[in-house]
Regions:
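Basic, amphipathic alpha-helical bundle interface domains used for macromolecular binding and assembly
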Residues: 1-140
Length: 141
């Protein structure tokens, strides 16, 4: 992956919804992580978000945020005023596909947060998940 990541074209990268960098932890960092959500708690939150999506999209041809069409994004990805201002500020850096992917991921983050609208922090988290390394030296495998 390290060798070829820099060769992947932007249109191909645009088809990836989430790209996140992981860093290696040393022993002390791993052992002193504090309280974290258990896998069971995370699973429960994801299942609740899926129920929210299934209910929201009842009667539609799709069930989940990842399946939204461009029209679906317009209808269901309602932004708070500060989220809209933030998105307007970064819009020129996005492709149309990237714009829609960010909104779909932000909608999912808002669902996990039980939020009716997408807020700025949901949107900025989604943007972070679209931050691809600029060269192959930052890619962890």
């Amino acid at each position: 992956i390290r060798k070829y990541f820099g060769r992947i074209s932007r249109p191909i990268l645009d088809r990836i919804d989430i790209c996140t960098e992981t860093v290696s932890l040393n022993y002390d960092e791993l052992e002193n992580r504090g309280e974290e959500e258990s896998s069971a708690q995370i699973r429960e939150r994801v299942m609740e978000a899926q129920k929210i999506q299934t209910k929201r999209y009842e009667g539609e041809s799709f069930r989940y945020n990842g399946e939204l069409t461009a029209q679906g994004v317009k209808r269901y990805c309602v932004l708070s005023a500060d989220a809209e201002a933030y998105l307007r500020g970064i819009f020129d850096q996005l492709t149309a596909r990237g714009y829609h992917k960010i909104l779909k991921v932000a909608r999912s983050i808002a669902d996990l947060d039980h939020s009716q609208e997408i807020k700025r922090h949901h949107l900025s988290e989604a943007v972070c998940y679209r931050s691809f390394p600029q060269d192959n030296t930052d890619v962890n495998v």
